[in-house]
């Protein structure tokens, strides 16, 4: 059994956000309206959370967020929801839109204006957004990135797509807004210093490249292609990367895993592959950067047991992504969670399908651990096998102290669970798991155990939820960025607003915490400013 809703539209949508890709505009508008009616203050923040790239956010030269801010990096869904705000609550849109390039990219301002025309919403007053861009040009912190994403003005004959046609027209309008000619506008764009490495490459001055200044995604592409070998740069790059504890990367862990799969390295040790040393060190260093960034957002102080679904349905593709399976997402997230967890289960993953057994990672190398991970796509999805294994250990080895057992259980799965066949027709996996644990553990210990249900967004879609929004021991979440876990699991007890008593956070509390991160606190309803 699963619940059709947690009882809160916002908690439902927060949990399912990882499934939101390329949706119909009407569906997005309907859902944004629903959460606005439930809680407008959090609803205005939700699109910015969806867009946010996990990192410390630079507001200006003097102000940077204290911790890494965690989001979903979901551009399309974020822009469509913001269009709803622009259409229905324009004051709230214009008062907060300056946050968008801070949590995302300066390209986002151009993209949302393009969306406004593409979907015939026609709600945006472009001069107000031009003013945001103009302010960015005057900021020492942001000026070069603003210039980087300004569309170059071209002749109409060279604009052959809807994007180039519309952004070319917008660029011309922006040049008029700035009071400069088209030629001066293009010269202004070219004066930007962001990504100087591209200019060096275009000038064929390869010896002048400074590897540490190349952005993470670009570095990833250069190293995994033929660029280094074609220009005799392999030795130069290798001598640099092997000395780096981390390397820039703001993507998702599964993108690193996908690169390994493309090179023939898969989990389970089925295919032994020797990676070029520069590739291995780059992937390891970029993974370590993702772990470091996540830990800068908070520390996990609990014993977290990560459970990896390796059932047959995990071989299905992820909704909205080409050549990416649920297994790709799940194994990369499981590895990530095992590394950011510093408790008793650091480097431990519990796999489950028809059966269940633990896998202990014996290396700190991302590439080597990926090879160790079990291969997915076999058998059913028996999550209760994890609980049965914990109960079995407790019965057979009662001398193991409670402090060595998990206090949080994370299930990384497509949520296509087997019928439990235990606990009655109205029992969820969450309910059944608690009942089983109560047979061998003290109630006060079981009451402290939390379950995190991480949906890897299969094409089958999510059937429902394992618990309600007001339950304090369960949370449903989805997506590709696992860094939010350090925020959610770093939560201390909260004081109940009604009773004044201290209690554990519910799913509603955790969603509110995610939407109250430092940068999102700048987002306010117009009538509250």
Sequence positions of predicted segments:
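Long lumenal/extracellular ectodomains of secretory and single-pass membrane proteins
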Residues: 1-329, 339-529
């Amino acid at each position: 059994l699963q619940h059709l809703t947690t009882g809160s539209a916002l908690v439902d949508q927060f949990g399912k956000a990882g499934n939101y890709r390329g949706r119909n505009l009407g569906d997005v508008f309907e859902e944004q309206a629903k959460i606005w009616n439930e809680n407008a203050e959090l609803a205005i923040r939700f699109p910015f959370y969806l867009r946010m790239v996990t990192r410390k956010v630079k507001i200006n030269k003097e102000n940077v967020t204290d911790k890494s801010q965690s989001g979903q990096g979901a551009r399309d869904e974020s822009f469509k929801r913001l269009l709803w705000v622009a259409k229905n609550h324009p004051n709230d849109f214009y008062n907060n839109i300056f946050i968008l390039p801070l949590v995302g990219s300066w390209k986002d301002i151009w993209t949302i204006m393009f969306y406004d025309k593409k979907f015939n919403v026609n709600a945006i007053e472009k001069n107000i957004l031009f003013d945001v861009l103009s302010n960015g040009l005057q900021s020492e912190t942001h000026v070069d990135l603003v210039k980087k994403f300004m569309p170059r003005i071209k002749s109409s004959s060279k604009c052959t797509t809807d994007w180039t046609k519309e952004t070319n027209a917008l660029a011309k309008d922006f040049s008029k807004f700035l009071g400069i000619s088209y030629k001066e506008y293009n010269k202004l764009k070219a004066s930007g210093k962001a990504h100087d490495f591209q200019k060096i490459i275009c000038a064929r001055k390869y010896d002048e490249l400074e590897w540490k200044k190349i952005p993470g995604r670009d570095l990833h592409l250069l190293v995994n292609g033929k660029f280094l070998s074609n220009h005799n740069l392999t030795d130069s790059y290798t001598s640099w990367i092997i000395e780096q504890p981390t390397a820039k990367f703001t993507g998702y862990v599964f993108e690193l895993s996908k690169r390994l799969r493309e090179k023939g390295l898969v989990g389970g040790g089925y295919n032994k592959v020797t990676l070029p040393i520069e590739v291995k060190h780059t992937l390891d260093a970029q993974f370590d950067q993702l772990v470091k960034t996540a830990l800068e957002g908070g520390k996990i102080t609990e014993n977290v047991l990560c459970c990896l679904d390796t059932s047959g349905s995990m071989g299905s593709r992820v909704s909205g992504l080409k050549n990416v399976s649920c297994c790709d997402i799940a194994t990369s997230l499981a590895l990530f969670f095992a590394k950011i967890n510093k408790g008793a289960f650091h480097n431990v993953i519990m796999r489950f399908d028809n059966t269940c057994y633990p896998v202990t990672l014996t290396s700190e190398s991302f590439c080597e651990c990926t090879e160790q991970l079990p291969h997915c796509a076999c058998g059913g999805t028996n999550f209760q096998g994890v609980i049965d294994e914990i109960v079995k250990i407790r019965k057979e080895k009662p001398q193991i102290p409670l402090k060595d057992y998990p206090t949080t259980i994370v299930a990384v799965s497509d949520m296509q669970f087997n019928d439990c066949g235990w606990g009655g027709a109205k029992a969820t996996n969450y309910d059944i798991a608690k009942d089983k644990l109560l047979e061998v553990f003290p109630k006060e210990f079981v009451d402290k155990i939390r379950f995190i249900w991480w949906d890897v967004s299969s094409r089958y879609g999510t059937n429902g939820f394992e618990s309600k929004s007001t339950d304090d021991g369960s949370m449903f979440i989805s997506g590709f960025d696992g860094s939010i876990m350090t925020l959610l699991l770093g939560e201390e007890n909260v004081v109940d607003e009604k009773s004044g008593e201290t209690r554990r956070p519910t799913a509603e509390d955790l969603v509110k915490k995610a939407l109250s991160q430092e940068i999102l606190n700048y987002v306010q309803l117009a009538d509250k400013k």
